[in-house]
Every structure is written in C-alpha cells, then in structure tokens.
Amino acid sequence: MLRYFTSGESHGEALVAFLSGLPAGLTVDQAFVDRELWRRQQGFGRGGRMKIETDKAHFLSGVHHGKTIGSPIAVMLENRDWQNWKESLPVETGDPEKHKRVASPRPGHADLAGALKYDFTEARYVLERASARESAARVAIGALAKLLLRELGVGVLSHVIAVGAVSIADREIAWEQIEPLARKNEVLLSCADADAEQRMKEEVDKVLRTGDSVGGVFEVVAHNVPPGLGSYVQWDERLDALLAAAVMSLQAVKAVEIGSGIQAAHSPGSAVHDEIGYKSDEGFAGFTRTRNHAGGLEGGVSNGQEIRVRGYLKPISTLRRPLQSVDFATREPVKAAYERSDVCVVPAAGVAAEAMVALTLARCALEKFGGDSMKEMKRNFQGYLEQLKNY
C-alpha cells in the first residue's frame, strides 16, 4: 500500500517527506522532480519567500543508481530561509527575547484554533506547521507518483480556470491546451486562455494595490486513466471520495468539485449524464461518451474518461491590511498579525493538487495491479488492458 507523511516547519531547517510502497525499478528522474518543485514556486502574486528558496529534492533513502529499490523513500528539501530564523526558532531553548511571537491570530488561518487545541500562548508554532510551505514536500513525492503513472501512460496536470471574478469555468479545456502550460519557463497564472490570463493578472494587480488577497479555482486533469480504478463496494474505496479528500487536504482549499458536479445539482438528469456509445477502435474497451460531466468517475470508479477535479481556493488569510483580531495575552482588540505572504497562489496550489491526485491514482493503481517491481506491475497492467480490449 502506498503511504506517505511529511514533516518540517515553514522556517525550520528542512522539510522531509516519507513515501512507502513504490515498486522497485522505477526510474527516478531528478530533473523532473526538481522541475515540479520549481513549478510550485511560480505564478504572479507570489511573495518574497519564493525569491529565497530554490527547492531541490535530496533523496536520503529508497533510491540508488537512479532507481527505486522497493524500500521506504525519504526526501529532504532544504529551507534556505532557515538561516534567517536560527535564533528566532531554535531547536534548543534559545533566547526568549529573540523569539518571534504571533501575538494576534489571523482570521481564516489555523492560528486561533491551533493555539486552543495545543494550549499555546501564541500562534508561532501553529503558523510554522499549518503553512502551505508544507505542500512542497508533497510535490516532491507526488513527482514520484507521476513518474509511476507515466509508466502506465497516465498524465496528470493542472490549469487555472478562475482568479477572483475572472473565470473560464464554463468551458472544458482540452488536454492538448493544458500540456504546454507545464513546459513554460515563465509562468504568469497558468491559464490556457491568454486573454483571460491577462484579466486574471489585472485582478491580482488590483488586490496588490489595496493590500488584499485573492483566491480562485484550479482544475487537475488526469489523462488516459483506464477504467476500473477505485471501487463502489466500500465507502472508503471510492475514488471520487479519495480524490476529494486529497485535494481538500491542501492549505486554503475550501471546496472540491468532480466533473460538472456543482452545475449538475441545478440541472435535470437528461442534461447531466454522459450518454454511452460504442466504436470498437476507441478508448480502452470501445465504449464512448458524448461528454464528460461525470469527470471520469461513476460510482466511485474511473470510467476511462479524463478525470477532472476542481479545487476552490479561498484568498490567502495573511493580509497586508490586516483584519480585526484580539491579542492573545491581553484579549484587547488589535489588528491581526502580518507576516511576509503571497497575494495569489492559485497556480501553485494547482501544482500541489496535481501531486495529491497523482499520489491517489498511484495508490489505486498499485492496489489494482500490484507488483513488487515495475516489471511485474507493468506486466499485470498490460494483462488488464488486454482484458479490456477483449471485453
């Protein structure tokens, strides 16, 4: 079973991710992993932290001579900014006068809830772990999941469909339009529509001028996923539930949609469900659809269409013009704490969501096809494709 955990704080020495369950013999493309980490750092509206960090994956175990060896993988990402925080956030007791307290909780952040839960007198430790910096570790191991899926012919990418009030959410963007976005070396807002992207930039510019922040919507597309991943037999095996939980787990995501789920709730069934046809030379088993409102999932199982998952991102909760809050110590009204932050992170969140979708699909693929080695897994996968072809 594919299992993963992360550790580390935003301004600590490093982030570490642990991944167990990958088969032996998977080629690890270091340049690809580092490129994924680079993609997460891009996008108009990112803060000053991204000028400090240059994330590179340092594999500590589980990978040798360029391949996985079947044992648990540990990967470390250095936090360069830690050099600026050694005295403020030491492992040992340190000098209390140099500690940087978060004295007033920020509305929308984990500050207050976390301080109450863990009995902290202020929110520094909450901020450190709840920060979206943690998602970099997920992107590193998500890149390995992408490499595994690539061996099965499956691709996972994202694009931005809304920033603030600017939206192209009513259109389905083809995979061929999304692919080039990941190859760009200059990333604006990762939208496939160039005109809409410029309007999105104007939206970010507007909130930059006012000291505010802005959210939006990204869509993750998994291309060439075979039917049969996930299951309807138990609630916790349903692929749509697994994907929703995976994407919702990302910082600032407040809603998840699969296919045209939101529109479907307001439409008659005849306008929602994807009619079925048959052409022997198409798809995995010859069955076709007139559209893909289901987002590639029916009954918790992949149906052979593209899987489409949308994440709805709230605006970042750290504002340069802070909202009203209360001082932890005095309980007196004050402005919420401010710490260097982003203004818009929708493209970066999309990359992190790619990682979560890839990890989820890789887990389901391993459960279905098994294999302690890549050779064994691919042999099992080819046998399943033959079964579908002869259905």
Regions found by a protein language model. Name each.
Residues 1-391:
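Generic N-terminal targeting/processing segments that precede catalytic cores or assembly contacts
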